[in-house]
């Protein structure tokens, strides 16, 4: 847990030259499936809410695609409460129900309409102090690269003993090629000393 508390301090509480928080909206992804992105996002979101007492949202990137809102400014209306008072979530289940109610058009399609994507992220920034977006792995989805220019940065979850160095470095390159800000690696299920080259990015 100490590792994640340090991550919160160095990543989410970092302040820019203008005195404002640098990383309020952060996406998390992985090089491949099974790295534990959802586990890490849930854990960090909970600790972030508890440690800062700020309003935190945990959202699945798939839910953003499935909401199809008539007005993106109302995205926060579809939040669900969690066991932590100041931590909210938007699930794919809630999003699918909204899709059935409202229907889909090009104007409110997250994948095809960049203006709608931007409006959704702006609305989340307005309603929450921190937003953590759970993206599928880079091997199976374009979630992270689609969001790359809209979020403050992207962190890559690395599962101890599973992810190869070449995969990890390739994922960093994919984010940077999408004009995203690579924030570093988050090691999940650590069982042995962390390689120095990973720590250098955190």
Regions found by a protein language model. Name each.
Residues 1-2, 13, 18-25, 29-35, ...:
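P-loop/Walker-type NTP enzyme "switch/lid" segment
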Residues 36, 65-69, 164, 192-195:
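Short, charged/polar "capping" segments at the starts of alpha-helices
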Residues 40:
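Hydrophobic positions on the alpha1 helix immediately C-terminal to the Walker A/P-loop
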Residues 43, 47:
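Active-site signature of alpha/beta-hydrolase-fold catalytic machinery across serine-
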Residues 49-50, 148:
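Gly/Ala-rich phosphate-binding loop of Rossmann-like dinucleotide-binding domains
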Residues 50-56, 178-183:
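Structural alpha-beta junctions
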Residues 112-202:
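Conserved catalytic-core segment of NTP-binding enzymes
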């Amino acid at each position: 847990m100490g590792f994640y508390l340090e991550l919160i301090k160095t990543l989410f509480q970092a302040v820019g030259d203008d005195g404002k928080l640098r990383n309020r909206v952060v996406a998390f992804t992985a090089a491949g499936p099974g790295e534990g992105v959802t586990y890490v996002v849930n854990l960090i979101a909970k600790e972030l809410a508890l440690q800062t007492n700020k309003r935190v949202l945990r959202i699945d990137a798939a839910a953003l695609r499935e909401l199809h809102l008539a007005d993106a400014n109302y995205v926060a209306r579809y939040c669900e409460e969690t066991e932590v008072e100041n931590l909210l979530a938007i699930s794919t289940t809630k999003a699918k129900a909204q899709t059935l109610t409202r229907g889909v058009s090009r104007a409110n399609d997250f994948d095809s309409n960049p203006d709608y994507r931007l409006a959704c992220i702006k609305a989340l920034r307005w309603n929450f102090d921190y937003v953590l977006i759970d993206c599928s792995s880079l091997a199976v989805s374009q979630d992270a690269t689609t969001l790359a220019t809209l979020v403050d940065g992207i962190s890559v979850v690395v599962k101890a003993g599973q992810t190869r160095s070449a995969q990890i470095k390739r994922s960093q390159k994919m984010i940077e090629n999408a004009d995203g800000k690579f924030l570093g690696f988050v090691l999940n299920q650590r069982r042995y000393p962390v390689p120095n080259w990973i720590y250098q990015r955190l």
